[in-house]
């Protein structure tokens, strides 16, 4: 569990222990099989008659409620800073000599207009080139429909959220624009678990017999929405269609928006509309250069597109900051295919046929492969830190095969942390955790009256879990959580990224010798007190950052 995934637990020392203590089970840990530090009231010290039991349970409920309300102010005093960097793995920047970057959604951020552009262009390609009904043009892009990390069952045409243990979060399964009832989902999958052989492959794709596709990058948001809209049209109009063909046609249309240059030309023609200038990319690059760090850029985007974007956000001298620039790299193939050589581009963008013996500063290279890159630069192992927004295409191979350190750029993190810092969210989550603990302890009472009370609590808990989901996204909830469990997205983020942050500008809050320490989160059989220290590194706490 990472810090963002466990922010409520991480907010203040003793918050969870105090919540557990509110349940009057002594130290609040005995119910989980953990020894109490001192004398504790037995769990079953309750009257035996039904009316007395009912009264006893509701007294415990009210006492826990009061105790929870007293906890909220202390939690509110330890809000997390949305501009902090969070660590999955201990890493010291003093060990990093070389910094690498992706381009899209790493060095440059785009406005909300870009996803509308991609959606509209792909929708029109479906109509004009794949002969889809012109009526689908009535569907517009909804930025609030989907979130990253969702899985799409290609054969059943349903979009869903899956947790780290391959379980579907019920209530987040959508066919078209309508939620699929839980009973139908359970019948469809013979439960809520998705077997490993049905999941997406290593890179999130539906290949080699896998029936699921995982949408991991930010550019996939309009693709998910378009898939859902066209599905909705066919369903509403009782049109028989093959879901596999629909998936492929939408995928090809989204790809063509990139491949045919539709997106690139539109951005270059109105760069101020599509590129957000606010992110302090130049300040980050200048800081690293001033400290003698080597820097390189590896992107799948074309040269002229990158040049115009970087000139806009960094300046026309942007290439002076980088030791190596590689465009149209075709990641993740760049990290695995040893056969493709580099090609140099001249100032006019013409590809040269010279054999590359050295990667020169100020030059732009196309394609190539990582093995040749390592040979020509000598930049190997944990001296290198590479940043990207795509967990699979940017980071997975680098950390698993080459030992590079990796940093994930997760723009959604900032908005989620701002929500998690609100009093309404903190009150709801604190009471939800307390109520869950109360249910866990009081389930030992099996008489009919007690069970009726517990059923009321379970109903309240279910309603609160739905409420916490809607804080982030009405359909799918948080990018990082499915109710109690981490999402499948977070599982991969935790595995492939040493650190993660909302944007590169977060680096400006730390010096170049800073060490990032991951929070020790308790295993189920460990004492919670071991992890309940306030984070002291960098600026994770909002109050500390404001004090500076």
Curated annotation (Swiss-Prot):
Residues that coordinate or bind Mg(2+): 102, 104, 389
Sequence positions that bind substrate: 251-259
EC top class named in words: hydrolase
Tissue and organ distribution: Expressed in brain, placenta, skeletal muscle, pancreas, testis, uterus, and small intestine. Reduced expression in pancreatic cancer cells.
Gene Ontology, cellular component aspect: cytosol; mitochondrion; receptor complex
Annotated region described as Disordered, given as residue ranges: 528-548
Keyword Glycosyltransferase: no
CDD domains to which the protein is assigned, alphabetical: HAD_cN-II
A matching Pfam family: 5_nucleotid
Taxonomy, superkingdom: Eukaryota
EC number: 3.1.3.-
Active-site residues annotated for this sequence: 102 (nucleophile), 104 (proton donor)
Keyword Metal-binding carried by entry: yes
Listed NCBIfam families: HAD-IG-Ncltidse
Family classification: Belongs to the 5'(3')-deoxyribonucleotidase family.
Name of the featured protein: 5'-nucleotidase domain-containing protein 3
Lineage: Eukaryota, Metazoa, Chordata, Craniata, Vertebrata
Gene that specifies this protein: NT5DC3
């Amino acid at each position: 569990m990472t810090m963002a995934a466990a922010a409520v637990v991480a907010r203040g020392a003793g918050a969870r222990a105090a919540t557990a203590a509110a349940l009057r089970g002594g130290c609040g840990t005995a119910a989980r099989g953990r020894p109490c530090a001192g004398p504790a009231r037995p769990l079953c010290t309750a009257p035996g008659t039904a009316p007395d039991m009912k009264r006893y349970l509701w007294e415990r409920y009210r006492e826990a409620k009061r105790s929870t309300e007293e906890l909220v102010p202390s939690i509110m005093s330890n809000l997390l800073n949305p501009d902090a960097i969070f660590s999955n793995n201990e890493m010291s920047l003093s060990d990093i000599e070389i910094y690498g970057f992706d381009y899209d959604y790493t060095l440059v951020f785009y406005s909300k207009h870009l996803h509308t552009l991609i959606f509209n262009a792909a929708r029109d390609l479906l109509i004009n080139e794949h002969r889809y009904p012109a009526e689908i043009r009535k569907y517009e892009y909804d930025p609030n429909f989907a979130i990253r990390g969702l899985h799409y069952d290609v054969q059943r045409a349903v979009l869903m959220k899956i947790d780290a243990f391959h379980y579907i979060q019920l209530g987040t399964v959508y066919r078209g624009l309508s939620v699929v009832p839980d009973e139908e989902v359970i019948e469809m999958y013979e439960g809520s678990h998705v077997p490993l052989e049905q999941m997406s492959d290593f890179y999130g794709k539906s290949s080699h017999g896998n029936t699921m596709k995982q949408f991991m990058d930010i550019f996939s948001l309009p693709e998910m929405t378009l898939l859902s809209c066209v599905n909705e049209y066919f369903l509403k109009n009782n049109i028989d269609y093959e879901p596999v063909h629909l998936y492929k046609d939408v995928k090809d249309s989204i790809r063509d928006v990139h491949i045919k240059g539709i997106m690139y030309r539109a951005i270059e023609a109105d760069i101020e509309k599509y590129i957000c200038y606010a992110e302090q990319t130049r300040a980050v690059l200048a800081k690293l250069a001033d400290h003698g760090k080597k820097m390189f850029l590896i992107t799948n985007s074309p040269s002229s597109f990158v040049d115009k974007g970087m000139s806009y956000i960094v300046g026309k001298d942007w290439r002076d900051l980088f030791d190596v620039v590689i465009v149209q790299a075709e990641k993740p193939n760049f990290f695995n295919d040893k056969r493709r050589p580099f090609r140099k581009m001249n100032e006019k963008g013409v590809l040269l046929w010279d054999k590359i013996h050295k990667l020169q500063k100020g030059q732009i290279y196309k394609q190539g492969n990582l093995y040749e890159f390592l040979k020509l630069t000598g930049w190997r192992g944990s001296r290198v830190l590479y940043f990207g927004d795509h967990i699979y295409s940017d980071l997975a191979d680098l950390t698993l095969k080459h030992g590079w350190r990796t940093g994930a750029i997760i723009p959604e993190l900032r908005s989620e942390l701002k929500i998690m810092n609100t009093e309404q969210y903190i009150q709801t989550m604190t009471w939800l955790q307390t109520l869950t603990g109360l249910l866990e302890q009081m389930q030992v009472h099996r008489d009919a009256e007690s069970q009726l009370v517990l059923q009321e609590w379970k109903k309240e808990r279910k309603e609160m879990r739905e409420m916490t989901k809607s804080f982030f996204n009405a359909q799918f909830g948080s990018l990082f959580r499915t109710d109690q469990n981490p999402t499948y997205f977070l599982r991969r983020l935790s595995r492939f990224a040493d650190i993660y942050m909302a944007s590169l500008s977060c680096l400006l809050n730390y010096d170049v010798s800073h060490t990032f320490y991951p929070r020790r989160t308790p295993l189920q059989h460990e004492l919670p007190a071991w992890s309940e220290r306030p984070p002291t590194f960098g600026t994770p706490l909002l109050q500390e950052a404001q004090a500076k």
